[in-house]
């Protein structure tokens, strides 16, 4: 997605060989026009999948998930990382290790909002090692719902999360795939395009 790649190049900051800071438009300050375009792109890619619900994780996945849900005409449910006083019982639970924060979080979804009749699109801001996506998949599977695919805003293709998910037969659609963050520079995966005659 060209507009996203340009935003990453212009406003993203490479902090190390595996950390990209995008707090100027995605995971702290949010660019609503960009989020709207991201939502439209996810909706376009998954429009034939009969999605009934979008599942994401708090908090950075919420904005792109809501915009995609708006385009698809479905609801969003986000996995919580902390227990809520109003949501104590009747929860699906999974553990997710965060390499960025170096901690394990117990994530949860209410059983009241997802069930076996749902066809789910999982959306998240980043895909690196795949832990968040695997945790969200576990919650959806516990509910007996089917997974249509995973939509990722930015995939760190140099890490193994995307490969692991695809090897499991999961459809993963990433809007920006980063090949490397070496020397303080973002390099995107180049996809060959077929020439139309």
Swiss-Prot record:
Question: Could you tell me which InterPro entries the record lists for this protein?
Answer: PRibTrfase_dom, PRTase-like, Pur/Pyrimidine_PRTase, Xanthine_PRibTrfase
Any idea of its EC number? 2.4.2.22
According to the UniProt record, one GO cellular component term is: cytoplasm
Which Gene3D superfamilies does the UniProt entry name for this protein?
3.40.50.2020
Q: Where does 5-phospho-alpha-D-ribose 1-diphosphate bind?
A: 128-132
One BP term from GO: xanthine metabolic process
Question: What terms describe the molecular function in GO for this protein?
Answer: xanthine phosphoribosyltransferase activity
The keyword Cytoplasm is annotated on this UniProt entry: yes
Please report any disulfide bonds recorded for this protein chain, giving both cysteine positions. Answer: none
- Binding, xanthine: 20, 27, 156
List where in the cell it is found.
Answer: Cytoplasm
Top enzyme category: transferase
Pfam families noted in UniProt: Pribosyltran (PF00156)
- The main location class comes to cytoplasm
Q: Which keywords annotate this record?
A: Cytoplasm, Glycosyltransferase, Purine salvage, Transferase
Describe the reaction catalysed, as an equation: XMP + diphosphate = xanthine + 5-phospho-alpha-D-ribose 1-diphosphate
Q: Which pathway does the record list? A: Purine metabolism; XMP biosynthesis via salvage pathway; XMP from xanthine: step 1/1
Recorded hits in HAMAP family, A to Z, give: XPRTase (MF_01184)
Outline what the protein does. Answer: Converts the preformed base xanthine, a product of nucleic acid breakdown, to xanthosine 5'-monophosphate (XMP), so it can be reused for RNA or DNA synthesis.
Q: Subunit details for this protein?
A: Homodimer.
Tell me the protein family, please: Belongs to the purine/pyrimidine phosphoribosyltransferase family. Xpt subfamily.
How is this protein named in the record?
Xanthine phosphoribosyltransferase
- Organism equals Bacillus thuringiensis (strain Al Hakam)
């Amino acid at each position: 997605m060209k507009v996203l790649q340009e935003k990453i190049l212009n406003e993203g900051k490479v902090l190390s060989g595996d950390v990209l800071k995008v707090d100027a438009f995605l995971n702290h300050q949010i660019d609503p026009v960009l989020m709207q375009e991201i939502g439209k792109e996810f909706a376009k890619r998954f429009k034939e999948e009969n999605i009934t619900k979008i599942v994401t994780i708090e908090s950075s996945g919420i904005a792109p998930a809501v915009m995609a849900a708006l385009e698809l005409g479905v609801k969003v449910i986000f996995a919580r990382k902390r227990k809520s006083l109003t949501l104590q019982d009747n929860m699906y639970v999974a553990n997710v290790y965060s390499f960025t924060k170096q901690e394990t979080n117990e994530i949860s979804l209410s059983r009241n909002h997802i069930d076996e009749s749902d066809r789910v699109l999982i959306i998240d801001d980043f895909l690196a090692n795949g832990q968040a996506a695997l945790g969200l998949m576990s919650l959806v599977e516990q509910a007996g719902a089917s997974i249509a695919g995973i939509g990722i805003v930015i995939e760190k293709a140099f890490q193994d999360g995307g490969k692991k998910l695809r090897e499991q037969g999961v459809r993963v659609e990433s809007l920006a795939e980063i090949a490397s963050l070496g020397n303080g520079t973002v390099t995107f995966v180049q996809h060959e395009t077929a020439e139309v005659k």
